[in-house]
């Protein structure tokens, strides 16, 4: 192929590089496979993984493939299509593809980011995505600049369609945020069968758990030092607007 290797690079231990790959000031080792039109610049790629298509790994990113920690022992870390990774750590068996753009993130285990998803941390706060969490569609997950403004997606949580997650938000078991919903922390904790979709808006210091569905143009907003706790089963929709914890049985 026409692979190019420029600036000081370290390549060792069963690395495969071919096609039109460009490796610039990077360390690649231990079984990594890099092909097609990939660019790896000022970053490291270690262990058995596959980076191909038009993927780019840039700006002090660290790719560390580790298999065998999950039920899918054989699944390898892959970055492909037009996925771009900047200033991020990608570990274990992660899958990044489509037009995903990832900046200042820590993504691990079997998490997936794909389609046109945007993951955007900053130099103060990374976005953290782990377990089997997925971000896809045109969804955006964005860290804030204040302390702890770190979005965290865990377990089987999913952010999809045109949803926005911003700031100190933690999504746990069986959480799906989709539609044009906006969730701005915080801190916000969503856990145990929570669905947020439509044009719903969740903002402030809020705990939503146990089978709660929020859709339509509903808003749950905690002002100042208030904390709102919603525990299901509950359906909140239409133009509903909640600004304090409902009395038991009132919803």
Label the predicted regions.
Residues 3, 9, 15, 21, ...:
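Residues at the loop-to-beta-strand transition
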Residues 250-251:
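Extracellular/surface-exposed low-complexity segments
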């Amino acid at each position: 192929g026409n692979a190019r290797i420029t600036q000081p690079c370290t390549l060792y231990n069963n690395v495969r590089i071919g096609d039109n790959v460009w490796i610039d000031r990077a360390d690649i080792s231990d079984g990594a496979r890099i092909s097609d039109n990939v660019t790896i610049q000022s970053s490291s790629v270690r262990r058995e993984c596959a980076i191909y298509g038009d993927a780019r790994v840039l700006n002090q990113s660290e790719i560390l493939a580790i298999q065998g920690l999950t039920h899918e022992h054989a699944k390898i870390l892959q970055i492909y299509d037009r996925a771009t990774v900047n200033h991020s750590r990608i570990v274990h068996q992660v899958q990044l593809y489509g037009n995903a753009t990832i900046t200042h993130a820590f993504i691990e285990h079997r998490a997936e980011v794909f389609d046109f998803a945007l993951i955007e941390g900053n130099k103060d706060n990374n976005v953290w995505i782990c377990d089997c969490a997925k971000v896809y569609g045109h969804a955006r997950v964005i860290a804030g600049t204040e302390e702890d403004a770190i979005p965290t997606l865990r377990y089987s949580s999913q952010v999809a369609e045109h949803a926005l997650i911003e700031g100190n938000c933690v999504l746990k078991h069986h959480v799906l945020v989709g539609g044009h919903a906006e969730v701005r922390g915080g801190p916000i904790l969503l856990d145990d069968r929570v669905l947020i979709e439509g044009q719903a808006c969740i903002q402030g210091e809020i705990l939503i758990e146990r089978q709660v569905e929020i859709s339509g143009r509903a808003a749950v907003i905690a002002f100042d030092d208030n904390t709102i706790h919603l525990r299901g089963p509950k359906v909140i929709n239409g133009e509903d607007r909640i600004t304090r914890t409902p009395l038991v049985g009132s919803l």
